[in-house]
Amino acid sequence: DRGVLNAFDKLGFKYVYDPNITGFTGKFSASGHCIIVRREEDDCIYHELGHFVAWIAGNVDYQREWEAIYDKEKSKVTFYNKGYVTQNPREYFADAYKDYVLHRSSLSSTRPLTYKYVKAAVAKVNSMTSADFEKMHKMYDAIWNKYDA
């Protein structure tokens, strides 16, 4: 989504490809100011962007409403990494964002509450203004500068 990528850029986040990382396929780090992935050809980047969306939209993956949706619709996940994706509401949101980007109509029809919630989070990010980005910079630049140095 263009608004998500714009926010990623405006906040100065970095995308890092590192085939030598171990222990994970991808990782979003708000404090580290980056997304790291092990395989460029993998759709993992969308999952990690999902963590970014949840964070920038106000940690929406920690809200009670989201946890209720997670409890209600996680059993409808049928793909190969179901165990990982459904282990907690945060991973479920990140993967739901991936599905929102790559398989929107399928997500909408099979997990409609999930779809609506992710869509609302994306809309929040899309509506962010320069003032919102400036506010986030004021809040986080000290942390980001520590990690970026």
Predicted feature residues:
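Active-site-flanking segments in enzyme catalytic domains
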Residues: 1-148
